[in-house]
Amino acid sequence: QNAWPVDMLQPQDVYVCDHFELKQDGPSIGDNVGNAIYARSHNGIVYAGAVRDINGLNELDDFVSFVRYYDPSHHFSTSGPRLNSTMIGINIPIRIGKATVLPGDVVLGRDGGVLFIPPQLAEQVVKTSEITRLRDIFGHQRLREQKYTAGQIDARWSDSIERDFTGWLKENSGKLPVAKEQVDEIVKERTR
């Protein structure tokens, strides 16, 4: 039954599963199911449970996975041919950690963990995160230059730091890891 949702995956989907934190005798994703997920979605998984066959999964270069545990066991009970878990739904609201996840949510996985973003908020989240990223790059540069103290950068910025940031954006537009058009729009918003 763990293959049913895999068969429904489309390109760019992310397989997100609440497997109730099952560890021993819990894994239902190994290198076979992992290969099937990757073949259909060209993406990876967010899995609140254990996976197995780590070496085989690691052979999938672009198969990104966020999982709770690794265990070499299988989701069939060791005492007979019964499943230790049963699927209760596909494309339904679930919990991953403390987050409620709805079908269609945007999945953002980073080294520090995973975020689930409602699709209607995705554009706002991206724009806000780009501004935060630029502020961080600017702040780190100014800290290395010893122009400002950590206390000044970590606190609400003074008007002079805000003006310096706006000037820095203008000077570096086109050289930053955010598209020039977006940087120019940020500058335009800041200088109204």
Specify the residue positions occupied by each region the protein language model found.
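Beta-strand-loop-alpha-helix segment that lines the small-molecule cofactor/substrate pocket
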Residues: 110
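Feature captures the catalytic cores and cofactor-binding loops of soluble hydro-lyases/lyases
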Residues: 1-103, 116-192
